[in-house]
Regions:
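Glycine-rich, often acidic-flanked micro-motifs
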Residues: 4-24, 33-37, 87, 99, ...
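Post-Walker A alpha-helix
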Residues: 121-122
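Active-site phosphate-binding and catalytic loops of NTP-dependent enzymes
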Residues: 29-31
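Short coil-to-beta microelement around the adenine-binding A-loop and adjacent beta1/P-loop entry
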Residues: 92-93
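An anion/pyrophosphate-binding glycine-rich loop and adjacent beta-alpha core
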Residues: 1, 27
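Charged, amphipathic alpha-helical linker segments immediately N-terminal to NTP-binding catalytic cores
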Residues: 41-85, 264, 277
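Conserved lysine of the Walker
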Residues: 118
Length: 280
Protein backbone atom coordinates (compact mmCIF):
# COMPACT_ATOMS: atom_id res chain seq x y z
CA UNK A 1 0.00 0.00 0.00
CA UNK A 2 1.05 3.63 -0.55
CA UNK A 3 0.77 6.18 2.26
CA UNK A 4 0.48 9.74 0.97
CA UNK A 5 1.44 12.41 3.51
CA UNK A 6 1.50 15.29 1.04
CA UNK A 7 5.12 16.27 0.47
CA UNK A 8 6.24 12.64 0.61
CA UNK A 9 4.81 9.24 -0.20
CA UNK A 10 5.72 5.88 1.32
CA UNK A 11 5.28 2.47 -0.25
CA UNK A 12 4.58 0.32 2.81
CA UNK A 13 4.87 -3.44 3.09
CA UNK A 14 3.38 -4.77 6.32
CA UNK A 15 1.27 -7.45 7.95
CA UNK A 16 -2.44 -7.39 7.11
CA UNK A 17 -3.51 -6.40 10.63
CA UNK A 18 -1.49 -3.18 10.40
CA UNK A 19 -3.21 -1.96 7.24
CA UNK A 20 -6.51 -1.24 9.03
CA UNK A 21 -4.77 1.12 11.44
CA UNK A 22 -2.95 2.83 8.58
CA UNK A 23 -6.27 3.25 6.75
CA UNK A 24 -7.90 4.80 9.82
CA UNK A 25 -5.33 7.61 9.72
CA UNK A 26 -4.39 7.96 6.05
CA UNK A 27 -7.19 6.16 4.20
CA UNK A 28 -8.88 9.36 3.00
CA UNK A 29 -5.73 10.64 1.26
CA UNK A 30 -5.67 10.53 -2.52
CA UNK A 31 -3.09 8.51 -4.42
CA UNK A 32 0.16 10.45 -4.93
CA UNK A 33 0.89 11.91 -8.36
CA UNK A 34 4.47 10.60 -8.40
CA UNK A 35 6.18 7.34 -7.41
CA UNK A 36 6.79 6.80 -3.70
CA UNK A 37 9.76 8.63 -2.21
CA UNK A 38 10.51 5.81 0.22
CA UNK A 39 9.97 2.06 0.21
CA UNK A 40 9.57 0.80 3.77
CA UNK A 41 8.60 -2.41 5.53
CA UNK A 42 7.29 -3.25 8.97
CA UNK A 43 7.84 -6.98 9.26
CA UNK A 44 9.10 -9.61 11.65
CA UNK A 45 12.92 -9.67 11.84
CA UNK A 46 12.91 -13.47 11.72
CA UNK A 47 10.55 -16.37 11.14
CA UNK A 48 10.63 -17.40 14.81
CA UNK A 49 9.73 -13.87 15.93
CA UNK A 50 6.41 -14.24 14.15
CA UNK A 51 5.35 -16.77 16.79
CA UNK A 52 7.60 -16.56 19.88
CA UNK A 53 7.33 -13.16 21.59
CA UNK A 54 6.37 -11.60 18.24
CA UNK A 55 8.42 -8.59 17.20
CA UNK A 56 8.42 -6.15 14.30
CA UNK A 57 11.24 -4.20 12.69
CA UNK A 58 11.14 -1.14 10.46
CA UNK A 59 13.16 -1.24 7.24
CA UNK A 60 13.88 1.49 4.71
CA UNK A 61 15.63 0.13 1.61
CA UNK A 62 16.79 -2.90 3.62
CA UNK A 63 18.25 -0.71 6.40
CA UNK A 64 16.75 -1.03 9.89
CA UNK A 65 17.52 2.05 12.04
CA UNK A 66 15.74 0.80 15.18
CA UNK A 67 15.82 -2.23 17.40
CA UNK A 68 12.87 -4.62 16.95
CA UNK A 69 9.80 -3.77 19.01
CA UNK A 70 6.91 -5.92 20.24
CA UNK A 71 4.47 -6.65 17.43
CA UNK A 72 1.78 -4.72 19.30
CA UNK A 73 3.79 -1.53 18.64
CA UNK A 74 3.98 -2.01 14.86
CA UNK A 75 2.07 1.15 13.97
CA UNK A 76 4.15 3.27 16.33
CA UNK A 77 7.40 2.03 14.78
CA UNK A 78 6.00 2.83 11.32
CA UNK A 79 5.31 6.45 12.31
CA UNK A 80 8.73 6.81 13.94
CA UNK A 81 10.33 5.21 10.90
CA UNK A 82 8.63 7.64 8.55
CA UNK A 83 10.01 10.50 10.63
CA UNK A 84 13.48 8.93 10.39
CA UNK A 85 13.26 8.63 6.61
CA UNK A 86 12.40 12.29 6.13
CA UNK A 87 14.89 13.63 8.68
CA UNK A 88 17.71 11.48 7.32
CA UNK A 89 17.22 11.90 3.59
CA UNK A 90 15.66 15.27 2.77
CA UNK A 91 18.33 17.96 2.66
CA UNK A 92 16.48 20.21 0.22
CA UNK A 93 14.61 21.88 3.09
CA UNK A 94 15.30 22.84 6.71
CA UNK A 95 13.74 20.19 8.95
CA UNK A 96 13.07 21.28 12.53
CA UNK A 97 11.79 19.09 15.36
CA UNK A 98 8.74 21.24 16.04
CA UNK A 99 4.97 21.41 15.88
CA UNK A 100 3.39 23.83 13.41
CA UNK A 101 -0.02 25.46 13.83
CA UNK A 102 -1.61 27.97 11.46
CA UNK A 103 -4.42 30.48 11.78
CA UNK A 104 -5.38 33.29 9.40
CA UNK A 105 -2.53 32.25 7.08
CA UNK A 106 0.03 32.82 9.84
CA UNK A 107 2.21 29.99 11.12
CA UNK A 108 3.60 29.46 14.61
CA UNK A 109 6.26 26.83 15.16
CA UNK A 110 6.79 25.18 18.53
CA UNK A 111 10.23 23.56 18.90
CA UNK A 112 10.35 21.61 22.14
CA UNK A 113 12.01 18.82 24.06
CA UNK A 114 10.14 15.63 25.08
CA UNK A 115 7.87 16.24 28.06
CA UNK A 116 7.23 19.87 27.16
CA UNK A 117 3.54 19.35 26.44
CA UNK A 118 4.03 20.20 22.76
CA UNK A 119 1.87 17.41 21.35
CA UNK A 120 -0.94 17.96 23.87
CA UNK A 121 -0.90 21.64 22.94
CA UNK A 122 -0.89 20.73 19.25
CA UNK A 123 -3.84 18.35 19.60
CA UNK A 124 -5.89 20.82 21.62
CA UNK A 125 -5.33 23.66 19.16
CA UNK A 126 -5.87 21.50 16.06
CA UNK A 127 -9.22 20.27 17.42
CA UNK A 128 -10.17 23.82 18.40
CA UNK A 129 -10.11 25.26 14.88
CA UNK A 130 -6.42 25.80 14.13
CA UNK A 131 -4.83 24.21 11.07
CA UNK A 132 -2.37 21.45 11.91
CA UNK A 133 0.69 21.60 9.65
CA UNK A 134 2.71 19.17 11.75
CA UNK A 135 3.10 17.70 15.20
CA UNK A 136 6.67 16.49 14.79
CA UNK A 137 8.49 18.33 12.03
CA UNK A 138 8.51 21.83 10.55
CA UNK A 139 9.34 21.62 6.83
CA UNK A 140 10.85 24.98 5.83
CA UNK A 141 11.80 26.19 2.35
CA UNK A 142 15.44 27.26 2.18
CA UNK A 143 14.82 30.32 0.01
CA UNK A 144 11.49 31.73 1.14
CA UNK A 145 11.48 30.56 4.76
CA UNK A 146 7.86 29.44 4.35
CA UNK A 147 6.69 26.35 6.24
CA UNK A 148 4.80 23.59 4.41
CA UNK A 149 2.16 21.19 5.77
CA UNK A 150 2.45 17.45 6.27
CA UNK A 151 -0.54 15.12 6.48
CA UNK A 152 0.34 13.32 9.69
CA UNK A 153 -1.37 12.45 13.00
CA UNK A 154 -0.49 13.82 16.43
CA UNK A 155 1.50 11.44 18.62
CA UNK A 156 0.17 11.62 22.18
CA UNK A 157 1.68 9.97 25.20
CA UNK A 158 0.62 8.76 28.64
CA UNK A 159 -1.91 10.96 30.48
CA UNK A 160 -2.42 13.28 27.50
CA UNK A 161 -4.19 10.48 25.60
CA UNK A 162 -7.09 10.30 28.05
CA UNK A 163 -7.15 14.08 28.46
CA UNK A 164 -7.64 14.71 24.75
CA UNK A 165 -10.26 11.94 24.55
CA UNK A 166 -12.11 13.61 27.43
CA UNK A 167 -11.93 17.08 25.87
CA UNK A 168 -12.86 15.86 22.38
CA UNK A 169 -14.87 12.62 22.72
CA UNK A 170 -15.54 12.37 18.97
CA UNK A 171 -11.86 12.49 18.02
CA UNK A 172 -10.34 9.61 16.02
CA UNK A 173 -7.54 7.68 17.72
CA UNK A 174 -5.54 4.57 17.01
CA UNK A 175 -5.27 1.99 19.74
CA UNK A 176 -2.91 2.83 22.59
CA UNK A 177 0.45 1.10 22.37
CA UNK A 178 1.56 0.25 25.89
CA UNK A 179 5.05 0.41 27.37
CA UNK A 180 6.96 1.79 24.40
CA UNK A 181 10.28 3.54 25.02
CA UNK A 182 8.21 6.75 25.08
CA UNK A 183 5.61 5.35 27.46
CA UNK A 184 2.03 4.67 26.37
CA UNK A 185 1.48 6.08 22.87
CA UNK A 186 -1.56 6.70 20.66
CA UNK A 187 -1.96 8.62 17.42
CA UNK A 188 -4.72 11.17 16.86
CA UNK A 189 -6.15 11.96 13.43
CA UNK A 190 -6.49 15.71 13.89
CA UNK A 191 -7.34 16.74 10.34
CA UNK A 192 -8.80 15.40 7.09
CA UNK A 193 -7.31 15.08 3.64
CA UNK A 194 -9.92 17.45 2.18
CA UNK A 195 -8.87 20.10 4.66
CA UNK A 196 -5.17 19.37 4.18
CA UNK A 197 -5.39 20.01 0.43
CA UNK A 198 -6.41 23.60 1.18
CA UNK A 199 -3.20 24.29 3.09
CA UNK A 200 -0.39 26.23 1.41
CA UNK A 201 3.18 27.18 2.39
CA UNK A 202 2.86 29.88 5.04
CA UNK A 203 5.02 32.54 6.64
CA UNK A 204 6.26 31.89 10.17
CA UNK A 205 5.15 34.77 12.38
CA UNK A 206 6.31 33.35 15.72
CA UNK A 207 8.70 30.82 17.19
CA UNK A 208 7.53 29.72 20.63
CA UNK A 209 9.27 27.27 22.94
CA UNK A 210 6.57 25.76 25.21
CA UNK A 211 6.97 24.09 28.58
CA UNK A 212 4.11 22.54 30.54
CA UNK A 213 4.24 22.96 34.33
CA UNK A 214 1.41 21.51 36.42
CA UNK A 215 -0.89 24.21 37.85
CA UNK A 216 1.32 26.99 36.49
CA UNK A 217 0.03 30.37 35.41
CA UNK A 218 0.95 31.43 31.90
CA UNK A 219 4.44 32.90 32.02
CA UNK A 220 5.74 34.55 28.87
CA UNK A 221 9.40 35.35 28.27
CA UNK A 222 10.68 37.28 25.28
CA UNK A 223 13.78 35.83 23.65
CA UNK A 224 16.44 37.80 21.86
CA UNK A 225 17.52 36.75 18.39
CA UNK A 226 20.73 35.08 19.57
CA UNK A 227 18.87 32.89 22.08
CA UNK A 228 16.26 31.92 19.51
CA UNK A 229 18.85 31.25 16.81
CA UNK A 230 20.86 28.90 19.01
CA UNK A 231 17.83 26.94 20.20
CA UNK A 232 16.11 26.76 16.82
CA UNK A 233 19.24 25.58 15.02
CA UNK A 234 19.84 22.91 17.68
CA UNK A 235 16.33 21.59 17.05
CA UNK A 236 16.96 21.26 13.30
CA UNK A 237 17.70 17.72 12.13
CA UNK A 238 19.83 18.80 9.19
CA UNK A 239 21.19 22.22 10.15
CA UNK A 240 24.79 20.98 10.10
CA UNK A 241 24.36 19.31 6.72
CA UNK A 242 22.90 22.42 5.10
CA UNK A 243 25.78 24.68 6.12
CA UNK A 244 25.32 28.28 5.01
CA UNK A 245 21.89 27.55 3.55
CA UNK A 246 20.74 26.42 6.98
CA UNK A 247 22.27 29.46 8.66
CA UNK A 248 20.62 31.83 6.22
CA UNK A 249 17.11 30.42 6.56
CA UNK A 250 17.23 30.26 10.38
CA UNK A 251 18.50 33.84 10.38
CA UNK A 252 15.65 34.88 8.09
CA UNK A 253 13.05 33.25 10.34
CA UNK A 254 14.21 34.80 13.60
CA UNK A 255 14.54 38.28 12.10
CA UNK A 256 10.89 38.43 11.09
CA UNK A 257 9.19 36.30 13.76
CA UNK A 258 8.09 37.01 17.33
CA UNK A 259 10.26 34.97 19.70
CA UNK A 260 9.00 33.62 23.03
CA UNK A 261 9.38 30.95 25.64
CA UNK A 262 6.22 30.12 27.57
CA UNK A 263 5.40 28.15 30.70
CA UNK A 264 1.80 27.04 31.01
CA UNK A 265 -0.54 24.91 33.06
CA UNK A 266 -3.79 25.58 31.19
CA UNK A 267 -4.08 25.28 27.42
CA UNK A 268 -6.89 27.83 27.33
CA UNK A 269 -4.41 30.47 28.49
CA UNK A 270 -2.06 29.53 25.65
CA UNK A 271 -4.84 29.71 23.07
CA UNK A 272 -5.87 33.16 24.31
CA UNK A 273 -2.28 34.41 24.16
CA UNK A 274 -1.75 33.11 20.64
CA UNK A 275 -5.08 34.40 19.33
CA UNK A 276 -4.92 37.82 20.97
CA UNK A 277 -1.21 38.69 20.95
CA UNK A 278 0.38 36.76 18.07
CA UNK A 279 -2.17 36.22 15.30
CA UNK A 280 -3.33 39.39 13.58
Amino acid sequence: MVVNIGLYAFKVTCEQQLTSTIDSIYGDASAPDNPADFEVKVVSPSFLRRFIRPQMSFYCDQHSPFKPLPASQAYAILEWGMNWCIATHDHTRLLVHAAVLVKNDQAIIFPALPGSGKSTLTAYMALSGWSLYSDEMAIIDLKSGLVSPLYRPVCLKNDSIDLVKKWFPDSVFTSTWKDTHKGDVAHLKASSWSRYTQYTPTEIVAVIFPKYILNSDLNIYSLNQLQAFETLSKNAFNYGVLGRLGFNVVNKIIKRAALFEIEFGDLRDVEAFLSEDIIK
